[in-house]
Design a protein with these regions (language model features):
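Acceptor-binding helix/loop patch of EC 2.4 sugar-transfer enzymes
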Residues: 54-55, 68-76, 130-164, 310-312
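Conserved donor-binding/catalytic core segment of Leloir-type glycosyltransferases
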Residues: 198-232, 238
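Short hydrophobic beta-strand element within catalytic cores of glycosyltransferases
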Residues: 297-304
Length: 433
C-alpha cells in the first residue's frame, strides 16, 4: 500500500497505557505520517507523550482515578463510580467512532469492555487489534502479577473464577478481532492463530545522547527498577548481592521505585549494568529495553530462559543475560567480573534495539497488520504453546496454585483441554510437589 493510502488510517490506542507501549506507537505512527491518538481511561503517571486534552477525556480519567482509589469496603461509592465510569466510556466510544478507523486495544481492555462495543466496531468495519502484554492473557494460576508469592494464597474457588473469566474474555476478543498480538509465553488460552509479539517488538524512543556517563566510582554500579518488588523478586536479588559483597565485590546498588522516567534514564546513563527481574517470561522487558539504548546490558531471570531459544527465532531474541532464577547470582557475578563480556553484551543490546525496536520500525510492522501484509513467520499456532513456567512467581508457588485448582475442580479447570500436551505439562508440574 502506498504511503498516501497508509496515511488514511486514524488510530485509537488505549484505553490503558502499559509500559509506554501506547506512547511509543503514537510516536512511531507520527513519524510515518499516520495519525494516532493515545486515550486512557485512567491517569498514567509516567506518560511520556502528550495525550489529547479535551474535557470529555479529562472527566473519563478523573472518574477512573476515583474508581481505582475507592476501596471495596466503601461499597456504595465503589459501585456508583464503576457505573459512572463505564457509562462515560460509552460517550468516549460514540465520540471515537467517526474519528478512527482502527482500534488498538491494550491490557485486554476496550473502551466500554462490552460485547456490544466490539460487535459495533466489527459491523462498521473498523480494524480491531488486541495487543497483550502479560497478565491480560496469562493463565492466572501462573501469574505473579495477580498472585505474588509474598501475598496470601488465593482460594481454589477464586482462582477458578478468574481462570474461566480470563479464558472467556480472550474468546470474546478472538471472535471480533482482526489480529491478536501475543507472546508464545502467554498464549496458553488462545484458540485462534496469533501474531508473535517478538516479531513486532517494543516501541521505544530514547535519545541516549541527551545523557552522558557520569560514572566515576570504582565499584560496580547496578540499577534495578521494579514496578513491584514482590513480583520482580527484589528480595532474592538483594540477598544474592549481599553474598557477592561477602566475597569482596564492591557493589553500588541503585533501587528505583515510583520515580519519573527521567530519573530512571539518568541512572541508566550512570550504571554498569541492570538487574531487571527474577521471574520474567521475556529476555528484554521494558526496563531492560531502556537500558539497552544506553548500551547497558541486563541480567534477567526467568523460567522462559530454558525455552526461549527453541520457541523464538535467533534474530528475534533480544540480547541479555537471560538465566533460570536459581542462576541469578552467578549471572550477576559473571557480569561484574568479565568487563569484555559486559561491554559486548551491552553493545549487542544497543544495536538490536536501535536497528529493530525503534518506534518507527515497530509502528511500521503494526502498519503491516492494518494493511494485511503479514509475513508468514509472524504467525503462531496456539497448539504449539508449551511454556508452563509463568511470570512473577517462583515455580514452587505456581505448582501449589495449579495443584489447588486441579484437586478442587479437576484438570479441565486449567482451561487448556484443547491443547492436550500443554495440559499434561501443567499436570506434571503440579505433581512434582
Amino acid at each position: 500500500m502506498k504511503k498516501a493510502e497508509s496515511a488514511q488510517w486514524k488510530i485509537f490506542i488505549g484505553p490503558v497505557e502499559i509500559a509506554g507501549i501506547a506512547g511509543g506507537l503514537v510516536s512511531g505512527f507520527s513519524k510515518l505520517g499516520i495519525y494516532a491518538e493515545a486515550n486512557f481511561s485512567y491517569p498514567y503517571p509516567f506518560q511520556s507523550i502528550p495525550v489529547v486534552s479535551h474535557w470529555i477525556f479529562n472527566v473519563w480519567q478523573l472518574l477512573g482515578a476515583a474508581r481505582a482509589h475507592t476501596s471495596k469496603s466503601n461499597l456504595v461509592r465503589k459501585v456508583a463510580l464503576v457505573l459512572l465510569h463505564n457509562t462515560w466510556g460509552w460517550l468516549i466510544f460514540i465520540r471515537s467512532l467517526p474519528r478512527f478507523n482502527a482500534f488498538f486495544f491494550l491490557g485486554g481492555q476496550t473502551i466500554t469492555n462490552s460485547n456490544l462495543e466490539l460487535w459495533l466496531l466489527k459491523c462498521l468495519r473498523k480494524k480491531i487489534i488486541f495487543i497483550y502484554t502479560g497478565s491480560d492473557s496469562r493463565p492466572p494460576y501462573i501469574d505473579g502479577g495477580r498472585f505474588p508469592a509474598s501475598s496470601s494464597r488465593p482460594s481454589a474457588k477464586y482462582l477458578n473464577t478468574l481462570t474461566k473469566r480470563c479464558k472467556k474474555k480472550l474468546g470474546l476478543h478472538e471472535k471480533f478481532a482482526d489480529y491478536l498480538v501475543n507472546s508464545p509465553a502467554t498464549a496458553q488460552f488462545h484458540k485462534r492463530h496469533y501474531i508473535n509479539w517478538f516479531a513486532l517488538g517494543i516501541p521505544k524512543l530514547i535519545n541516549s545522547s541527551n545523557f552522558y556517563d557520569k560514572k566515576t566510582q570504582d565499584s560496580v554500579r547496578i540499577v534495578h527498577s521494579p514496578s513491584s518488588s514482590g513480583v520482580k523478586g527484589t528480595s532474592v536479588i538483594i540477598a544474592a548481592l549481599d553474598r557477592l559483597r561477602d566475597k569482596g565485590f564492591l557493589i553500588d546498588w541503585i533501587n528505583i521505585q515510583g520515580k519519573p522516567n527521567s530519573v530512571v534514564l539518568d541512572e541508566l546513563s550512570r550504571c554498569d549494568f541492570v538487574v531487571d527481574q527474577l521471574y520474567s517470561d521475556t529476555p528484554l522487558a521494558t526496563f531492560a529495553t531502556e537500558a539497552a539504548f544506553f548500551g547497558k546490558p541486563a541480567v534477567v531471570g526467568g523460567y522462559f530462559a530454558s525455552d526461549v531459544s527453541s520457541i523464538i527465532s535467533a534474530d528475534e531474541i533480544p540480547p541479555s543475560l537471560f538465566v533460570l532464577p536459581e542462576l541469578i547470582e552467578s549471572a550477576i557475578e559473571r557480569m561484574i567480573l568479565d568487563d569484555s563480556f559486559r561491554f559486548e553484551l551491552g553493545q549487542k543490546a544497543k544495536q538490536f534495539v536501535e536497528s529493530t525496536w525503534t518506534v518507527e520500525l515497530v509502528a511500521g510492522r503494526y502498519l503491516k497488520l492494518l494493511e494485511n501484509e503479514i509475513p508468514d513467520h509472524w504467525w503462531r499456532n496456539p497448539k504449539d504453546v508449551s511454556y508452563v513456567g509463568g511470570c512473577g512467581m517462583p515455580l514452587s508457588y505456581a505448582q501449589l496454585l495449579i495443584s489447588d485448582l486441579i484437586k478442587k475442580f479437576g484438570v479441565s479447570a486449567l482451561q487448556v483441554s484443547d491443547k492436550p500436551e500443554l495440559e499434561q505439562a501443567f499436570v506434571s508440574l503440579a505433581s512434582e510437589i
